[in-house]
UniProtKB/Swiss-Prot annotation:
It comes from Chlorobium chlorochromatii (strain CaD3). This is DNA mismatch repair protein MutL. PANTHER family: DNA MISMATCH REPAIR PROTEIN MLH, PMS, MUTL, DNA MISMATCH REPAIR PROTEIN MLH1. HAMAP family: DNA_mis_repair (MF_00149). Signal peptide: none annotated. SUPFAM superfamilies: ATPase domain of HSP90 chaperone/DNA topoisomerase II/histidine kinase (SSF55874), DNA mismatch repair protein MutL (SSF118116), Ribosomal protein S5 domain 2-like (SSF54211).
Length: 644
């Protein structure tokens, strides 16, 4: 007697449904793909009870005749491909012919359809995959799928569905991704009898503003790259829009939403230090590639893809993202996000909400006529580092018709990272003697192009010995002095180590350091790079060393503390962040050696710090991703004071 038997189709469909239909969001995705493949220009999504009670997708596509309508719910029935070779030339979202059969088998399923030349439409009702009713009915052109009581006949699957809030979140994210990928389609969504949106225009930026807030689109970097192999277009978020949710990173390949680790890592690396630890930037990118170069038949959900030559794709993708990131000003703006209160209403009201708060992509609006300001990075326009520096230099003049300034380059400064002698640099002993008393804790390299006449210098104030407030041509610029100096020291340290020329000043009296066992192990690991950085250290007994020279920007008397703190910071970074050795060392050095909050600076020190900051590659964030610069425009001030 045979033991192996062929499963009935009803059982097989339920089993395959476990792969294709994992939750209500899976149903929505499959049905939306069918609607788009049918050439729809209008699609409506109706949901009840987070999709557990009802999912209805209606479109105005081509519709189906009776034979196709009956066949579409059979396994492996599809109009998308005819042979395996067609998989190499896919121009549709669906292709397997499994989804409708799987959905139909685990729900009360209804299909209504009418073609353009038909007088009446057709209605088919299924219970658990079995046809129970067929009717001719009045219907609009196109197709409507209604899925009721999902998993009603698979209680184990229904039991493992999450809360309505969770299931609705997944479902809404799927719908949102399609509305962004297909702006030419009119989209309408209704949840529990409440209309959520009804998009009739084809502006993807307006849709982004709807989802994330009115100023969101102005905070994006546009990406556009045309080539024969991998055209790329879309938008990238500025660092202040960082979110931990990966659903806010949308990669569409041939307009199919995909997940690909290489693309994620390439974007992350392109942003580099602009990102705060464990955060990711907002991404909405569309990539077009020959269908024969990708494999979308990797997983039943069709979210994963493989490239035939991933290395080549990355070599073309990464430079585009890196270039887009480098060409934009990432300084933070303070922007007004609520209209000004009317004269009859209080300015702030009784709300306990702070007037200034961090940006949130889903921040609730404040009612009662109250007004709220937001720390966002929405600029009036995207500007470059040089333009921001000119804005700062021209802030000293009341008239805009003044000579332009370019951001200082390393060459203009005699080398920002140049290995100047003690007599040539403010880091030298002679300069320390001649400088003001306020310069004891740090020194910065002089600039060859500092303007000689004080009356044309930018106006700078130090606030609470923590922030530098600068008048710029368009308003105000606020700089965190600690992280600004940290950025300068970080890039200088990397350059010095790469040049492999020790940048040390010898100590008159060598300093002894006794390490603990683990500290000495770390010291041995980074000993060569410490020497390149400028630490001239000689072994002196068991786990003991003598510091005979240090980098020129190490404060006298802090040599031992700096070295010990660096080693501690290095170990912490190695454990948490998995950084490359020199990058880790540069971060540790700059963090421990930068000027501190509470330290008073002279006017010359403040000017030198700002000029050195704008000579760096990334003046907007510290090596750990914290913002350095915040801007407040005159226009924003006028709005805050009700002048506009």
């Amino acid at each position: 007697m045979p033991i192996i038997t062929r499963l009935p189709d009803s059982v097989a469909n339920k089993i395959s449904a476990g792969e294709v239909v994992q939750r209500p969001a899976s149903v929505v995705k499959e049905l939306l793909e069918n609607a788009i493949d049918a050439g729809a220009t209008k699609i409506s999504v109706t949901i009840k009870d987070a999709g557990k009670e009802l999912i209805r997708i209606a479109d105005n596509g081509v519709g189906m005749n009776r034979d196709d309508a009956l066949l579409c719910v059979e396994r492996f029935a599809t109009s998308k491909i005819k042979s395996a070779d067609d998989l190499d030339a896919l121009h549709t979202l669906g292709f397997r012919g499994e989804a409708l059969a799987s959905i139909c088998s685990v729900s009360h399923f209804e299909l209504k359809t009418r073609q353009a030349d038909a007088t009446l439409g057709l209605l088919f009702r299924y219970d658990g995959g079995s046809l129970v009713e067929e009717l001719e009915v009045q219907a609009e052109q196109g197709t409507s799928f209604s899925v009721r009581n999902l998993f009603y006949n698979v209680p184990a699957r229904r039991k493992f569905l999450k809360s309505n809030a969770t299931e609705y979140h997944h479902l809404f994210e799927i719908v949102k991704s399609f509305t962004l990928a297909y702006p030419e389609i009119e989209w309408r969504m209704v949840n529990d009898d409440e209309e959520l949106f009804n998009f009739k225009n084809n502006d993807v930026l307006e849709r982004l503003n709807f989802y994330y807030g009115d100023d969101f689109a102005s905070s994006l970097i546009e990406v556009a790259e045309q080539n024969d192999y991998l055209p790329i277009h879309g938008y990238l978020g500025k660092p202040a829009l960082q979110k931990k949710r990966k659903l806010e990173q949308y990669f569409f390949i041939n307009r199919r939403l995909v997940q690909n680790r290489m693309l994620l890592q390439a974007v992350q690396q392109a942003y580099g230090d602009l990102l705060v630890e464990r955060q990711t930037p907002f991404v909405l990118l569309f990539l077009t590639i020959d269908p024969s170069r990708i494999d979308v038949n990797v997983h039943p959900a069709k979210l994963e893809i493989r490239f035939d030559d991933e290395r080549q794709v990355r070599s073309m993708f990464y430079p585009v993202i890196k270039r887009a990131v480098q060409l934009h000003d990432f300084s933070t703006n303070i922007s007004v996000i609520e209209p000004f209160a009317s004269a009859s209403e209080p300015f702030v009201g009784s709300s306990s909400q702070p007037i200034f708060s961090s940006t949130s992509s889903q921040a609730p609006r404040m009612g009662g006529g109250s007004r709220r300001f937001d720390l966002s990075d929405a600029p009036e326009r995207a500007i470059t580092k040089n333009e921001l520096y000119r804005n700062y230099r021209e802030g000293a003049f009341s008239s805009p018709s003044v000579a332009s300034y370019d951001a200082p380059s390393p060459l203009q400064q005699g080398g920002l990272f140049a290995l100047a002698s003690a007599e040539e640099s403010l880091f030298g002993a002679q300069a320390v003697h001649e400088a003001s008393e306020n310069i004891e804790a740090f020194q910065l390299s002089p600039l060859d192009n500092i303007v000689e006449h004080k009356e044309v210098e930018p106006k700078i104030w130090q606030l609470h010995n923590k922030y530098l407030i600068c008048q710029i041509k368009t308003g105000l610029m606020i700089i965190d002095q600690h992280v600004a100096h940290e950025r300068v020291l970080y890039e200088r340290a990397l350059e010095v180590m790469q040049q492999n020329v020790p940048n040390a000043q010898q100590l008159l009296f060598p300093q002894k350091v006794e390490f603990r066992a683990w500290e000495y192990e770390v010291f041995e690991e980074i000993r060569d790079d410490l020497y390149r950085l400028g630490f001239n250290v000689r072994l002196f007994g068991n786990r003991t060393v003598m510091i005979e020279g240090v980098p020129q920007d190490v404060k006298s008397g802090s040599e031992v503390t700096i070295l010990q703190d660096m080693i501690t910071q290095y170990q912490e970074n190695a454990t948490k962040l998995k950084l490359e050795r020199r990058d880790n060392l540069a971060k540790s050095y700059s963090c421990r050696n930068a000027i501190m909050t509470g330290q008073k600076l002279s006017m010359e020190e403040m000017r030198s710090l700002i000029d050195n900051l704008f000579a760096t590659r990334e003046p907007y964030t510290c090596p750990h991703g914290r913002p350095i610069i915040i801007k407040l425009s005159l226009d924003q001030l006028d709005k805050m004071f009700g002048r506009k």
